[in-house]
């Protein structure tokens, strides 16, 4: 039987469930597929099939994560659910499944718990732009405790607002009751998905963003000049476009005089394509792997940033010992690696394998950096951590 082709008729969104352990993230994921399967918009995935997660690797880190897909009448969703707290931290920091928005699951009986807070903070640091809240286990609240739910909601709204998530919709329901088919609770799942449809905007497509291509290789073609190759990360580049070469050395401007793909000339290259760009007046020694070619003034090179980082445990192939301020590993961004010096925040003496921490990095060479960008940390040829740039300092 021939493989089904992916029909792109609806906008595609990546989301995930986040929240404290045992508040019902996986049950909710199953309940969503059940409610939508009744309308022919999903295949029902039961709890055990989601909970039995495959291992995947992102930036050298093993993550357990389940990917489920479903549709609403308006959109196609890819939904990631992770079993353990550490897997969420790793998944969000490495960007294994970049989220356009998240469903924060909170048990109405417990309210916000430590991991609820940690996931909200992480979501902010790694750039998850929107959150919709599902207040779960509402069936376990008695009439006389109904007022407590209002307090839980108020506390949640304050928590979210503190971290920059204003006016997040909060839907009350019971994932378990919906999964069991209780009609009034299935309706709540539909209400939740409507809130997700309405409050998590479709992200801008990569081709609509300013052009950027990390340089992977440089060739010299006699009589024609210098060609740089790489995969276009975003935007579109056309013959005749003015571009900048950013990173490692002083920024330079040039003009793209040719775009090639598989040795064929093209009028333009766009996001996702592997291309060669012919650059006017640039010598082979003027450019190198690790620089980026981009739309003028869309990206600058920097040497100092704050990063949100997950440090691998010894069992994951990471370090065996802690590190301190002054630690100098290699930081990998796109196609380049640069040595950086770590400064730990005040009050943090050391970082242990398995920790999730935010610290400052001073790079020894300038690199084209942006907030929200992912990086890996390596030492002696192995990955010891991964992170996201939470703030550019200089």
Swiss-Prot record:
**Residue numbers spanned by region G1:** 19-26
Chain spans, region G2:
60-64
Region annotation (G4) ranges: 136-139
Where, by residue number, does the polypeptide cross the bilayer?
none
Instruction: List GO molecular-function terms, semicolon-separated.
Output: GTP binding; GTPase activity; translation elongation factor activity
Q: What Gene Ontology cellular component terms go with this record?
A: cytosol
Ranges where the record places region G3: 81-84
Could you tell me where this protein is found in the cell? Answer: Cytoplasm
- For the region G5, give the residue spans: 174-176
Positions bound to GTP = 19-26, 81-85, 136-139
Q: Name one Pfam family in it.
A: GTP_EFTU_D2
Q: What catalytic activity does the UniProt entry give for this protein? A: GTP + H2O = GDP + phosphate + H(+)
InterPro entries (alphabetical): EF-Tu_GTP-bd, EF-Tu_GTPase, EFTu-like_2, EFTU_2, G_TR_CS, P-loop_NTPase, Small_GTP-bd, T_Tr_GTP-bd_dom
Q: Which residues bind Mg(2+)?
A: 26
The UniProt record lists the EC number as 3.6.5.3
Q: Which UniProt keywords apply?
A: Cytoplasm, Elongation factor, GTP-binding, Hydrolase, Magnesium, Metal-binding, Nucleotide-binding, Protein biosynthesis
- If you read the UniProt record, what top EC class would you report for this enzyme, in one word? hydrolase
Q: Which residues form the tr-type G domain?
A: 10-204
Q: How does it assemble?
A: Monomer.
Regarding protein family, the annotation reads: Belongs to the TRAFAC class translation factor GTPase superfamily. Classic translation factor GTPase family. EF-Tu/EF-1A subfamily.
Entry function: GTP hydrolase that promotes the GTP-dependent binding of aminoacyl-tRNA to the A-site of ribosomes during protein biosynthesis.
UniProt name for this protein? Elongation factor Tu
The organism encoding this protein is: Chlamydia abortus (strain DSM 27085 / S26/3) (Chlamydophila abortus)
